[in-house]
Curated annotation (Swiss-Prot):
The chain crosses the membrane at residues 21-35. Coiled coil: none annotated. This is Cytochrome b559 subunit alpha. Signal peptide: none annotated. This b-type cytochrome is tightly associated with the reaction center of photosystem II (PSII). PSII is a light-driven water:plastoquinone oxidoreductase that uses light energy to abstract electrons from H(2)O, generating O(2) and a proton gradient subsequently used for ATP formation. It consists of a core antenna complex that captures photons, and an electron transfer chain that converts photonic excitation into a charge separation. The gene is psbE. GO terms for molecular function: electron transfer activity; heme binding; iron ion binding. It comes from Pisum sativum. Heme binds at residue 23.
Length: 83
């Protein structure tokens, strides 16, 4: 037999009007904020990932693969200069 912790049950919480008033505002707000974060391109700037049109440039159409084991730093420098 378990004792009572004095907390409200989950069923009481999700059936209360106050819960739905608060969450009917916060859930759509989070969705809209996430959509704006991605659609404005701010997510690309914050995380440093290239935009879809920046993966392949006019001069570099191939995939930047590191092929040499001992000259990998030179290849990385060459790839970073091409950006």
């Amino acid at each position: 037999m378990s004792g009572s912790t004095g907390e409200r049950s989950f069923a009481d919480i999700i059936t209360s009007i106050r819960y739905w008033i608060i969450h009917s505002i916060t859930i759509p707000s989070l969705f809209i904020a996430g959509w704006l974060f991605v659609s404005t391109g701010l997510a690309y700037d914050v995380f440093g990932s290239p935009r879809p049109n920046e993966y392949f440039t006019e001069t570099r159409q191939g995939i930047p693969l590191i092929t040499g084991r001992f000259d990998s730093l030179e290849q990385l420098d060459e790839f970073s200069r091409s950006f």
